[in-house]
Structures are given as structure tokens and as C-alpha cells.
């Protein structure tokens, strides 16, 4: 019997042993099979997570940020222990002792889930396993993935420290609110750095690890608090905090940004605008979208915050003034359902959800509001973010909207969403009433930059970025009209003309495939023989066309492309009047080269870009400072900047043209609206039917330009470059010169100054004086004799006829570099559009 029993148990033992051996061999085979072609865990040592790219102003303040995944990388040594412990207690309490997998943890998690009936659930995967899943494997719920995860976890634990593993985990994990990693989550939920988090706040972040979408701190408040409290209890059990601290933190309410207890980080930044969005557009093109949105770039913008604000307000004021003068009421086009108006919480919630502009501060902040009632003499409104008080009743008196056309009761209805702002007293700022506003249909752009460095100081691409993201400074290509004429005059001055050269202002007829083209001056008058200076000051079209014919449109085309106004300009005469399309960005950049004496300068919105490691990968400024390293320069001496920029225009030509453009401001088409206390030059531009109006002007330091027009071109009633854009330039520059100053334009050594009669172009004596006298710069050898210097392409006599056809002769002239050139009837007549006017 004993022998039988021994034999029976021996057989069982043998079978068990064989079973264990077979299981071991099977497991070994499985692990060998799945462990052959696993991803290399060594890539984790070169972990470069997707991180936020941030834009800073010159003062080092963050003004915008861009991210595919909003992540702020923090090394393990800078992550507070309380944060690490919170996640360990929530996700992997044996993290610091297990070899990558945790049998006890799996069993304990299952027991807790059963005991709590599913209310207390912690992950069965270790933190190491989660790292493997997130970095090297897919998220498939398959046995194969779990086996690979286990194998990789064991391997990684052998080569990486626990701190290295938890660094990967805490920087990669998604925690809701577009927050990746604990640092971004701490900012999103509490607007705090990690070092300032309380145990309860750290516990809430850890609670989000498994179900970030189901534990919103407002919408799922009770669930969020329950899960936070579970983590706090675990932290006490694991010995990371005391029972007293755990109890105190569990009793505290959950306060977050989302519940309104803390200001959001985004609220500390200015609203996104045209400037930073253009940086996004340009750098995404230059660096690639992946690097821009995920590379953790540090971008130093050129923007001057005060001037940017002034650019916004100056342009907005001009656009609103024109819109209100038209009297058309359009509103926002948004409405709120009538049933929501009965309850304040309902209409406030509905109003907050609407996509209406909230970035306008013209005359004070503009608020979205809903019309709650249309009464006989007023609109009763509800204003977003503002509680009604006896001192500030939320009504708009009917008298406030007398500027509108149409019937009061037809213009408004209950539920209409409108924009309003406070009207306040100029003397003491006290509240007067709420006043109705609207985003204009007419649009425009403004841009200002440093003439020497190309640094764009301000850029406004429309009335409101939130209303329309189209940047009309860089993306809207429109006809510049007469704002292009300086490039025709530059070509002429470099071809032997002088500011005193006489050109005939007389009718011209040109036979084209589309018919006979008869260009005219804006005044529909002809002025006969006229000096070049007067031609540009008064924006004479016929003189410009004659110049373009004489110099040759191929030469004008070359100048326009050299200055960057166009990439490929058609060599047609109508283009000399600004008939081809360009952008404000290009035109302002081109004018800067007049102002700086003819050196190439490229507009830039960015001073420098640094990568995630702090290495500079782009710097705009290429000039070098010769003596900046000297501790102290002699009194009155400034550092010497060695310019290595290309010269694209003769310095004398640049000065002559600048002087002539000063005349535009002093007595020409901009004289009524531009009047600064420093020397100023510029040119107006107005196209046919006033569909586009421009003004581009400059001082010795800053060049700025304005464009106004409808996105779908149509006439601006009574519009002109001087009348519409001149005031925008004036308001902006009044502010700019306070900071940047201004002085006389630099005079080249080659200039010989001679008194000229600006009406006749004749040379005057050195002692001549009067309104007709202007001191003109001439190159050596080009000084006129006493009398009048005529354009050699036209026969001039006492009985000069107003010719209607161009001469058929050519002539030799001396250009600015001393060489000779042949000019004459070189124009090529192609398809002609209407072109510019004045």
C-alpha cells in the first residue's frame, strides 16, 4: 500500500515537474520569440519630446506660444518629490522596488477593485510598462503587446535609473486640457510651477493619469475630488505624507483655473494677433511645421509693444470712422435663442460660447452683449463679464445710434448679439453710457519698421484678428497706385535725370490691343513743362508715364524687382502707375531703402531663434560692431557698425528721391494730413475709383505704411491715400518719434547743393529766397547752368505744343555711376489695366 502511495505521489511530482519545465520552456520560447525584433530601448536615452515654442518680446516677456502638444520639459531633479510620490501612489506603489513588472501590484489592484466595487482603481501596469507602451509600442489591448511591454520593461530597468524612467513618464503623460507632462498640467489647472503645488494639487494631477477626460474639475467635480482623495489616502499609506496632511488636503475643496479660482496662464498673455501669427507663418515655412510646433523654439520678436498697440488703434480708428460715416448697420450676425434670455445664467453661457471678436480695445474694451429687449427709446442689453449696477445700467439709448440708417425697430431684435463699449468722460473717466459698435466692412493694414535693421516694430493686418485672420499687410496683394511712382523716379534719377529736369505734362495716346489708352492726371488737367520734383509732389500721372517711356519699362521693371516690390513685374506702361499688385509688407520694405541711403534691408519680425538647447539657430542682424567690446568710448562717439549689406541704389539718388518725397509731405498730396515735428518723406497712393488707398512714409529712423480697402474691391467714397491713410500714419508716428526720435536725412558727400526754382526748374543765385526756392542736390558734373534744363527727349520752345505722341529719337545720358546709357522710346505695350491715379 505504502509503495502504491509513494508511486502515486511520485508520478504526480514527476508530472508537475515536467509541467513546470514545459511551462518554463514555453514561456522561454514565447519571450524569445517576441523578444527578437523589439524596438530599441536605447532611443529613450535621446528623448526629445514635443515641446512648446514660445515668442518673447524685447523685454523677455512671453507674448504667444505655439504647440502641437503643450508640454514643458522638466528634468527629474527639478520635479518635486511630492509630485513623483503622488504618481507612484496612484499608478505604481512598488515602483522603486520592482524590476519592471509587479506581480504584487497586479494582485493588489485586482483586490482593491473588487473591494471598492470599481470605485478605487489603480493601474495594473507599472510606470515602466507605461513608458514602454507610450514610447515604443502601440496601445493595442493584446497579449502580444503586453508580452513585449514586459520584456522591454525588464530590459530598461537594467540600464536606466528609476529617476530617468519617471522623468520620461512625467514629461510624456497626457493629463487633459491639451497638457502633456506634469509641468504643463500644473500651469493649465493651477497656473503654478511644480514647486508651488500642494499635496492635494499633486494628487489631482496624478488622479488624471488614467482618465483625464472623465475627471474635469468643474463638470465632474465629485468624481475628481473622490479620485484625488483616493490618491491622498494612498500617499499616506505609502508613507509619503502624514495622515494629518492627507486628512487636511482631502477636506479642502478642489480649486482650479477651470473653476475660476486662479487666473489662467493664457489670460496673462496678450490676445493672439497678426504679428505673432505672421511669425508662425514665416517660421513654419523656414523651419518646417513639425519643428516650429514641436521643437521648443525660443523666438525673440522685434515687436515694440507700445507701438503695436498704437498701430492697432490708429488703423482701427480710421476704419471705424469711415464705417460709421456710411451709416450701415450689420451687427455681428449672431443671435441667442429667445428661451435663453429669460435666465441670466443661460444667456451668459450662450454668449460666452459664441465666436465674436473680443480683441478690440478702441476707445476701451469692446464687449459682446445680447439685446434682451427693444424698447421705444433704448435697447436693454446684457453685457458679457459685466454685472449690471445702478451706476452702470445696461442699456443703449436710442440717441446713441443716430448715425445709423434704417428703422430702429427693423435694425434690432431680441436675441441679437452686438458689440458695446463704455463711453466715459474725458475729464475724469466716469461712466456715461454704453455705446454700440460694430466691426467695419472696410479693412486695411499698417506696418512700421526700422529703416536700418529691418526690424518690424508693429504690424496690424486688419481691424480685428479674431474677426478675420487674413493678414492684409503680408497676404493681401493690391494695386499700390501712385505709391509705386518713386521707383520710376529712382530709375530716372539713376539714368541722368535730376530733380530739376523738365518733363512735359501733356496728353498721351497709346494704341493697345484693347484699344486707345488715354491716361490722365487725377485733376483731368495738363500742366505743360514741369520739373521732376513737382511731378512726384503732385503725383502727375502723365509725367510718370513719359519718364517710364524715356527710361524704358525694362529698366523700371528691374528697379521694382531689385527693391523687392514685385517678383516678376510686367514691363507695361500701366505698371508705372502702380497697376500691378503687391503687398504692404513688400512696399514698406522697399521704401526703407530710400530712407537708409540705398542699402539693402530685409523686413524681419524675428531678431533671433534658439532651439530647445539654447543654441542660436537664426539671427537676423548680420552687421558687426567694430568697437562694441571697448569698455568706454570717447565722449560724443557712438559704436561703429560695419555694414556688410549690398548697395542697391546710389546714395545720391536715394537722397534726391528722399528730398523729393519730403516735398510730397510739405506741399504735395500728403501735406494736409501729415505734419510731424521731424523731417518726414512719403508718398500717397490711390487707385482708380479709390478702390485701394495707401500712404508710405518715413523719418530718418522709421518707415511706416498704411493700406485701406475692401477685401472684395469696391470704391471708397471720397477716399484718397492722403485723406484716409495719412491720418493713420500721423497718429502712429506722433507716438513713435517720442521713443525713436528723428532728425535730418543723411546727406552724401557727393551732393552739391544749388538753389532751384521749383516751379520752373531754373537755377537761382545762392542768395535767392522765397517759397519758390528749393535747394537741390546734384552730382558733380550735373549742376545746371543758369536757365532751365529740359528733358532732352522733347523739343522745347516758346510755342511748345502739348504733344500727343511720344518722340521717336533716342539720347545718351550719364548714369549715377559715370557710365553712359541710351534712353528713349523703349516701352513695351502689353495688356494694360486701369492702373493708379494719384
PLM features: what roles do these ranges have?
Residues 87-88, 235, 311, 376, ...:
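Active-site SXXK
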Residues 253-254, 263-268, 302-304, 562-628, ...:
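Active-site-proximal helix/loop microenvironment
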Residues 96-106, 180-183, 242-245, 470, ...:
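Short, well-structured active-site flanking segments
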Residues 115-141, 195, 262-266, 272, ...:
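Conserved catalytic neighborhood of penicillin-recognizing serine enzymes
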Residues 273-291, 444-479, 490-491, 595, ...:
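Active-site beta-strand/loop architecture of penicillin-binding DD-peptidases
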Residues 119-384, 547, 561-562, 566-568, ...:
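Non-catalytic, structured segments within soluble enzyme domains
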Residues 1-56, 94, 114, 322:
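N-terminal type II signal-anchor transmembrane helix
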Amino acid at each position: 500500500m505504502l509503495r502504491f502511495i509513494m508511486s502515486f505521489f511520485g508520478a504526480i511530482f514527476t508530472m508537475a515537474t515536467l509541467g513546470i519545465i514545459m511551462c518554463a520552456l514555453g514561456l522561454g520560447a514565447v519571450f524569445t520569440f517576441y523578444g527578437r525584433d523589439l524596438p530599441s530601448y536605447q532611443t529613450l536615452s535621446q528623448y526629445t519630446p514635443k515641446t512648446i515654442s514660445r515668442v518673447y518680446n524685447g523685454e523677455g516677456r512671453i507674448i504667444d506660444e505655439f504647440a502641437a502638444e503643450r508640454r514643458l520639459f522638466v528634468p527629474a531633479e527639478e520635479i518635486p518629490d511630492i509630485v513623483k510620490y503622488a504618481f507612484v501612489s496612484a499608478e505604481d506603489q512598488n515602483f522603486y522596488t520592482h524590476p519592471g513588472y509587479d506581480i504584487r501590484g497586479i494582485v493588489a489592484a485586482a483586490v482593491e477593485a473588487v473591494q471598492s466595487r470599481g470605485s478605487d482603481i489603480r493601474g495594473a501596469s507599472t510606470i515602466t510598462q507605461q513608458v514602454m507602451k507610450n514610447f515604443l509600442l502601440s496601445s493595442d489591448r493584446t497579449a502580444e503587446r503586453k508580452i513585449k511591454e514586459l520584456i522591454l520593461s525588464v530590459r530598461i530597468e537594467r540600464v536606466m535609473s528609476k529617476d530617468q524612467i519617471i522623468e520620461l513618464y512625467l514629461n510624456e503623460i497626457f493629463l487633459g486640457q491639451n497638457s502633456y507632462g506634469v509641468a504643463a498640467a500644473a500651469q493649465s489647472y493651477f497656473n503654478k510651477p511644480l514647486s508651488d503645488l500642494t499635496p492635494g494639487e499633486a494628487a489631482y494631477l496624478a488622479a488624471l493619469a488614467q482618465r483625464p477626460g472623465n475627471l474635469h474639475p468643474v463638470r465632474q467635480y465629485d468624481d475628481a475630488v473622490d479620485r484625488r482623495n483616493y490618491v491622498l489616502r494612498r500617499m499616506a499609506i505609502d508613507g509619503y505624507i502624514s495622515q494629518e496632511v492627507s486628512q487636511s488636503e482631502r477636506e479642502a475643496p478642489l480649486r482650479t483655473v477651470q473653476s475660476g479660482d486662479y487666473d489662467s496662464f493664457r489670460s496673462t498673455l496678450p490676445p493672439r494677433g497678426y504679428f505673432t501669427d505672421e511669425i508662425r507663418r514665416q517660421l513654419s515655412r523656414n523651419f518646417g511645421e513639425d519643428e516650429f510646433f514641436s521643437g521648443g523654439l525660443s523666438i525673440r520678436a522685434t515687436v515694440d509693444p507700445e507701438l503695436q498697440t498704437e498701430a492697432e488703434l490708429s488703423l482701427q480708428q480710421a476704419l471705424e470712422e469711415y464705417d460709421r460715416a456710411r451709416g450701415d448697420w450689420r451687427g455681428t450676425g449672431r443671435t441667442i435663442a429667445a428661451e435663453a434670455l429669460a435666465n441670466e445664467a443661460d444667456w451668459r453661457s450662450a454668449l460666452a460660447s459664441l465666436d465674436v471678436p473680443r480683441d478690440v480695445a478702441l476707445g476701451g474694451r469692446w464687449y459682446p452683449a445680447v439685446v434682451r429687449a427693444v424698447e421705444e427709446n433704448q435697447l436693454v442689453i446684457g453685457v458679457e463679464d459685466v454685472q449690471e449696477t445702478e451706476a452702470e445700467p445696461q442699456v443703449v439709448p436710442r440717441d446713441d445710434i443716430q448715425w445709423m440708417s434704417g428703422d430702429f425697430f427693423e435694425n434690432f431684435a431680441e436675441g441679437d448679439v452686438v458689440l458695446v463699449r463704455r463711453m466715459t468722460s474725458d475729464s475724469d473717466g466716469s461712466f456715461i453710457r454704453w455705446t454700440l459698435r460694430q466691426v467695419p466692412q472696410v479693412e486695411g493694414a499698417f506696418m512700421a519698421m526700422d529703416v536700418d535693421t529691418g526690424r518690424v516694430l508693429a504690424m496690424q493686418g486688419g481691424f480685428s484678428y479674431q474677426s478675420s485672420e487674413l493678414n492684409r499687410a503680408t497676404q493681401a496683394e493690391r494695386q499700390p497706385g501712385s505709391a509705386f511712382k518713386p521707383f520710376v523716379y529712382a530709375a530716372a534719377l539713376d539714368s541722368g535725370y535730376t530733380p530739376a529736369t523738365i518733363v512735359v505734362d501733356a496728353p498721351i495716346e497709346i494704341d493697345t490691343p484693347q484699344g486707345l489708352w488715354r491716361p490722365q492726371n487725377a485733376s483731368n488737367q495738363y500742366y505743360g513743362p514741369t520739373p521732376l520734383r513737382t511731378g512726384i509732389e503732385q503725383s502727375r500721372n502723365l509725367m510718370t508715364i513719359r519718364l517710364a517711356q524715356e527710361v524704358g519699362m525694362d529698366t523700371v521693371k528691374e528697379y521694382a524687382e531689385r527693391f523687392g516690390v514685385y517678383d516678376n513685374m510686367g514691363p507695361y506702361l500701366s505698371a508705372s502707375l502702380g497697376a500691378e499688385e503687391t503687398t504692404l509688407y513688400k512696399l514698406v520694405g522697399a521704401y526703407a531703402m530710400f530712407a537708409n541711403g540705398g542699402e539693402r534691408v530685409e523686413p524681419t519680425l524675428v531678431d533671433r531663434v534658439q532651439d530647445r538647447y539654447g543654441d542660436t539657430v537664426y539671427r537676423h542682424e548680420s552687421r558687426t560692431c567694430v568697437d562694441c567690446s571697448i569698455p568706454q568710448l570717447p565722449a560724443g562717439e557712438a559704436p561703429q557698425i560695419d555694414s556688410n549689406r549690398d548697395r542697391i541704389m546710389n546714395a545720391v539718388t536715394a537722397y534726391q528721391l528722399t528730398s523729393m518725397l519730403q516735398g510730397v509731405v510739405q506741399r504735395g498730396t500728403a501735406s494736409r494730413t501729415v505734419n510731424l515735428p521731424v523731417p518726414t518723406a512719403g508718398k500717397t497712393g490711390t487707385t482708380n475709383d479709390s478702390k485701394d488707398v495707401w500712404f508710405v512714409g518715413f523719418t530718418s529712423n522709421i518707415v511706416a505704411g498704411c493700406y485701406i480697402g475692401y477685401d472684395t474691391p469696391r470704391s471708397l467714397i471720397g477716399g484718397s491715400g492722403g485723406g484716409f491713410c495719412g491720418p493713420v500714419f500721423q497718429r502712429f508716428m506722433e507716438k513713435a518719434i517720442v521713443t525713436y526720435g528723428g532728425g535730418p536725412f543723411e546727406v552724401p558727400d557727393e551732393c552739391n547743393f544749388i538753389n532751384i526754382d521749383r516751379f520752373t526748374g531754373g537755377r537761382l543765385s545762392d542768395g535767392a529766397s522765397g517759397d519758390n526756392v528749393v535747394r537741390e542736390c546734384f552730382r558733380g558734373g550735373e549742376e545746371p547752368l543758369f536757365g532751365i534744363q529740359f528733358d532732352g527727349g522733347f523739343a522745347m520752345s516758346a510755342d511748345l505744343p502739348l504733344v500727343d505722341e511720344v518722340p521717336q529719337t533716342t539720347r545718351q545720358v550719364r548714369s549715377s555711376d559715370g557710365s553712359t546709357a541710351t534712353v528713349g522710346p523703349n516701352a513695351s505695350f502689353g495688356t494694360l489695366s486701369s492702373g493708379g491715379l494719384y
